[in-house]
C-alpha cells in the first residue's frame, strides 16, 4: 500500500511539497511563525488526539457492533446516521429530544433510553483512558511540543486562546505537567463551578512588595472546551 500524501492548504492555496518530509518541515515552520503573531487563537480538533482517542467513524463502528443483535436499535441508528452525517453529537441531540418528548407525554421509550446509554457508555469508555499508559506517550509528546511552542514566547504578546472540541484530558494533563497556568472558566475549591466571566479576568502577580505594582502572569493559557469535558 502506498503512503498517503500529506496535504497542506493555506486558504485555497495548496502549499504541499513533493514529499511528506518536506511538507512536514513547511508545516512546522508555518506554525512556528504563526505562534509569534501578536494575537493568536488555536482550534484543536479530534486529529490531535487521534493516536489515542477513536475518530467519529471509529465510534460509529464500535456502537454498531454493540447493537448488531438489536434490530430495532439498528434501524433507528442507521436512519440517525444518514440524517446527521454520522455526527454522534447531533445523533445524541436528536435522541435526547425524543426522550424528553416521550417523558413529557408520560410514555417513556425504553429503546431510546437504551440506545442513548449505549452511545454515552461507548464514548465514555473510549475517552476516559489512563493517561499514564505509555502507549499514549506519542500523543502526549505532541501536545507538549505544541504548548512549549505557543506559551514560551515573548511575554509582551497577547495571551494565547486555545479552543478544542475534544472531551479528553490530554490538554489538562500536559498543561499540569509543564506547570503552565491556564484558565478554563472554572472557579471554586471543593466544589468547582463554571463561570464564563472568568475568561475576561486577567491574572497577575505582585512584583513590588512596597507598592501595589503587578504584572500579568507569564505563559497564561485561556482554555475553552467547546463541547464539554469527560470530567465535568
Please annotate each region the language model reported.
Residues 1-34:
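N- or domain-start disorder-to-order transition segments that initiate the globular core
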Residues 23-29, 137-151:
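A short, well-structured juxtamembrane/interface segment
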Residues 21-71:
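An N-terminal structural lobe/cap that precedes and organizes the functional/catalytic core
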Residues 42, 61, 121, 144, ...:
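A broad, structural surface signal
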Residues 118-142:
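Glycine-rich phosphate-binding "P-loop"
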Residues 31-34, 150-157:
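Alpha-helix termini
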Residues 83-113, 153-232:
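Extended, H/D-rich, highly charged conserved domains that either
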Residues 64-96:
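A phosphate-binding glycine/aspartate-rich beta-alpha loop in the early core of alpha/beta enzymes
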Amino acid at each position: 500500500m502506498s503512503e498517503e500524501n500529506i496535504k497542506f492548504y493555506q486558504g485555497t492555496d495548496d502549499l504541499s511539497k513533493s514529499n511528506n518530509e518536506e511538507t512536514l518541515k513547511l508545516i512546522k515552520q508555518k506554525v512556528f511563525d504563526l505562534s509569534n503573531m501578536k494575537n493568536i487563537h488555536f482550534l484543536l480538533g479530534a486529529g490531535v488526539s487521534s493516536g489515542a482517542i477513536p475518530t467519529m467513524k471509529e465510534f460509529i463502528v464500535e456502537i454498531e457492533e454493540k447493537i448488531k443483535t438489536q434490530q430495532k436499535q439498528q434501524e433507528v441508528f442507521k436512519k440517525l446516521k444518514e440524517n446527521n452525517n454520522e455526527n454522534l453529537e447531533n445523533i445524541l441531540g436528536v435522541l435526547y429530544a425524543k426522550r424528553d418528548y416521550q417523558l413529557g407525554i408520560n410514555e417513556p421509550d425504553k429503546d431510546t433510553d437504551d440506545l442513548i446509554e449505549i452511545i454515552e457508555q461507548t464514548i465514555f469508555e473510549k475517552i476516559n483512558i489512563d493517561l499514564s499508559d505509555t502507549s499514549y506517550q506519542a500523543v502526549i509528546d505532541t501536545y507538549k511540543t505544541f504548548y512549549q511552542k505557543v506559551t514560551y514566547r515573548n511575554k509582551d504578546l497577547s495571551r494565547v486562546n486555545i479552543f478544542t472540541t475534544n472531551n479528553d484530558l490530554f490538554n489538562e494533563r500536559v498543561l499540569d505537567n509543564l506547570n503552565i497556568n491556564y484558565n478554563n472558566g472554572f472557579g471554586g475549591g471543593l466544589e468547582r463551578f463554571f463561570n464564563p466571566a472568568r475568561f475576561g479576568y486577567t491574572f497577575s502577580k505582585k512584583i513590588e512588595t512596597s507598592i501595589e505594582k503587578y504584572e500579568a502572569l507569564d505563559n497564561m493559557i485561556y482554555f475553552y472546551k467547546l463541547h464539554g469535558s469527560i470530567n465535568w
